[in-house]
Amino acid sequence: DLVKVIKEAIVNSPYDFMITQGLRSAKYQNELYQQGRTKRGLKVTNADGYIKKSNHQMKVDGFGYAIDFVILNGKALDWDTESKYEAVAKHLLEVGHKLGIDLEWGGNWRFKDYPHIQIAGADKIAFKK
């Protein structure tokens, strides 16, 4: 479902973007979790991949339910322009709605995750064991 949304949305998005993350292993999720904790860098997630899982991780149906994206500014990656992330996220949410696929944007969360989009209700779907 998420692939359908991205394929349609990327055609007429207000800004060019590309997917940077999709399905993640628990090990990789934990590496991201360690940023800003045991490794240098800013905290980028509250999900450690083992106790608290991310919707990027595989669910029982074999799919991840989240993606991260980055705004493209020519050939450069623009990680910092909130308004561009908001515009692309709004567009993704609208395309999802048109296709009957409800999405959530990480920019609406208390812990802001502007490059993150996931299928609404993904937290209720069991993870693969």
Located regions from the model:
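Active-site acidic/histidine clusters and adjacent loop/turn architecture
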Residues: 1-18, 84
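Short, well-structured alpha-helical interface segments that form or flank functional binding sites
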Residues: 4, 27, 87
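Residue-level signal for well-ordered alpha-helical scaffold segments within enzymatic catalytic domains
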Residues: 8, 31, 91-94
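Sec/Tat-exported extracytoplasmic proteins
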Residues: 13, 36, 96-99
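Acidic helix-start/capping segments at beta-turn-to-alpha-helix junctions
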Residues: 19-32, 111
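Glycine-rich loop at the start of a catalytic domain that most often binds anionic cofactors/ligands
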Residues: 31-39
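Short hydrophobic/aromatic-enriched beta-strand-loop microsegments
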Residues: 40-45
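Catalytic cores and adjacent binding grooves of peptidoglycan-active enzymes
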Residues: 47-48, 52-129
